[in-house]
Amino acid sequence: IISIARLVENKQIKHQVEVIKQLVTKHPNIQLNIYGHGNGLSEYRQLVEDYHLSEHVKFHGFKTHINEEIAKAELMLSTSKMEGFGLAILESLSVGTPVISYDVDYGPSELIQDGFNGYLVPQGDINQMVEKVDQLLNNTQKLQQFSINSIESAQQYNATTISTKWQNILN
């Protein structure tokens, strides 16, 4: 599982750590790789340590070329309180990594079609996020279908498609 976010309160990284805490017994090989930087890093590291999750939650800092890491992940988590057009979500979908996100205004619901290329869960509902992650980790067929659907849904944002749309508007 991957997360790409600034390590600040608004992104609610604590919620992602809570998700892993609840799933680690059922999924002992679960791994959350968090990419990003911010002033919350020491607090989140301490939380991971307090929960004895150091083997399951890793902080990798900021990375400019992240697509390879996203493509390796089975899922992406987004727990932001508010989100514009989420480029990290779009990048994930474009490489076939489904996203489970809080359903906050704007961004996520523009990109994620609930039950097609990921899941949207109510903002702050950690238990439902746990349930959705568990569902996909337990159902490789559904996970693979979501992956295919992710790539398909991201196609509408590729350069060729956008260029054609602009040409149609300008003509």
Locate each region found by the language model.
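Conserved donor-binding/catalytic core segment of Leloir-type glycosyltransferases
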Residues: 1-11, 17-20, 33
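Conserved acidic donor-binding segment of nucleotide-sugar-dependent glycosyltransferases
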Residues: 113-115, 119-126, 135-140, 155
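Short glycine/serine-rich donor-binding loops of glycosyltransferases
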Residues: 86-89, 108-111
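Short hydrophobic beta-strand element within catalytic cores of glycosyltransferases
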Residues: 98-102
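C-terminal alpha-helical cap of glycosyltransferases
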Residues: 159-171
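C-terminal "capping" alpha-helix adjacent to the active site of nucleotide-linked donor transferases
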Residues: 19, 125-144, 148, 167
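Aromatic "clamp/platform" in nucleotide-sugar-dependent glycosyltransferases that forms part
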Residues: 62, 81
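Nucleotide-activated donor-binding/catalytic signature segment of Leloir-type glycosyltransferases, i.e.
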Residues: 45-61
